[in-house]
Curated annotation (Swiss-Prot):
Name of the gene: TSPY3
Function noted in UniProt: May be involved in sperm differentiation and proliferation.
Stored InterPro entries: NAP-like_sf, NAP_family
Major localisation: cytoplasm
Family recorded in the similarity comment: Belongs to the nucleosome assembly protein (NAP) family.
Keyword field contains Cytoplasm: yes
Protein name according to UniProt: Testis-specific Y-encoded protein 3
GO cellular component assignments: chromatin; cytoplasm; nucleus
Gene Ontology molecular function terms on file: chromatin binding; histone binding
Compartmental location: Cytoplasm; Nucleus
PANTHER family associated with the record: TESTIS-SPECIFIC Y-ENCODED PROTEIN
Gene Ontology annotations of biological process type: cell differentiation; gonadal mesoderm development; nucleosome assembly; spermatogenesis
Keywords associated with the record: Cytoplasm, Developmental protein, Differentiation, Gonadal differentiation, Nucleus, Spermatogenesis
Keyword Cytoplasm (UniProt): yes
Length: 308
């Protein structure tokens, strides 16, 4: 018999299977650990131990993610059942009261207020569910982004090529900008949603004749309509180039990559930030190679020619 005031929730079949999956993952993890321990003591092969430890870590991470999913779904099921019970109670209460006559503006506003009060916890539940889902997806994306970054390190000039080939960015880059970008080794973008939506752009450089910084960080506050400059790393120009940097910044007042790079608050610089955050970072490979225009008098084949 269930004590008065307690709640019991049904666990869907997919969740019971999920719990079994976590149990099997944990059991496999223990068995793998025991077997590897025996092999290590008998053969003293350090490399084998490292490989199994890596597999165990991956398996453990999958188990944690699965458990997070299960607990999140259980919480959602509980909240949904509680909401259904409250709605049914409200309907029974309304049926017990004689039907109302035409509503006056005052009574309509009172009813509207009551509906809005009921809607608030539903909105809060939706925000919580969305936040959990976003955090879960970010955890799943991270190992892929880390692997992508490691692979890009093996492609010389990858990011300089990507930026120069972008149809909007290419119009903002001069020959001097391209030479400066040739020293760029990596690009990273991080987004934070709480307490404010913030986009952080990090450009990594090897030693070059222009500036001393190894990392240039630019931060933007993001809202529905724009990217607004928030913070930027001051550029430490070398003395031999400082005068030239000043000349370039004041000689050309139009929007270009150098003015965005050297002056965080330059008018229109939010356009470049939006391109980097929303387009280049998400799929840079599509801009690494560009289409080669067909020569006159030749027919285009099914296989497109590409320029690196």
């Amino acid at each position: 018999m269930r004590p008065e005031g307690s709640l019991t929730y049904r666990v869907p079949e997919r969740l019971r299977q999920g719990f079994c999956g976590v149990g099997r993952a944990a059991q496999a993890l223990v068995c793998a650990s025991a077997k590897e321990g025996t092999a290590f003591r008998m053969e003293a092969v350090q490399e084998g131990a490292a490989g199994v430890e890596s597999e165990q870590a991956a398996l453990g991470e999958e188990a944690v993610l699965l458990l997070d999913d299960i607990m999140a779904e259980v919480e959602v099921v509980a909240e949904e059942e509680g909401l259904v019970e409250r709605r049914e109670e409200a309907q029974r209460a309304q049926q017990a009261v004689p039907g109302p006559g035409p509503m006056t503006p005052e009574s309509a506003l009172e009813e509207l207020l009551a509906v809005q009060v009921e809607l608030e916890p539903v909105n809060a539940q939706a925000r919580k569910a969305f936040s959990r889902q976003r955090e879960k997806m970010e955890r799943r994306r991270k190992p892929h982004l880390d692997r992508r970054g490691a692979v890009i390190q093996s492609v010389p000039g990858f990011w300089a090529n990507v930026i120069a080939n972008h149809p909007q960015m290419s119009a903002l880059i001069t020959d001097e900008d391209e030479d400066m970008l040739s020293y760029m080794v990596s690009l990273e973008v991080e987004e934070e949603k709480h307490p404010v939506h913030l986009c952080k752009i990090m450009l990594f450089f090897r030693s070059n004749p222009y500036f001393q910084n190894k990392v240039i960080t630019k931060e933007y506050l993001v809202n529905i309509t724009e990217y607004r400059a928030s913070h930027s790393t001051p550029i430490e120009w070398y003395p031999d180039y400082e005068v030239e940097a000043y000349r370039r910044r004041h000689h050309n007042s139009s929007l270009n990559f150098f003015n965005w790079f050297s002056d965080h608050n330059f008018a229109g610089s939010n356009k470049i930030a939006e391109i980097l955050c929303k387009d280049l970072w998400r799929n840079p490979l599509q801009y690494y190679k560009r289409m080669k225009p067909p020569e006159e008098g030749t027919e285009t084949s099914g296989d497109s020619q590409l320029l690196s």
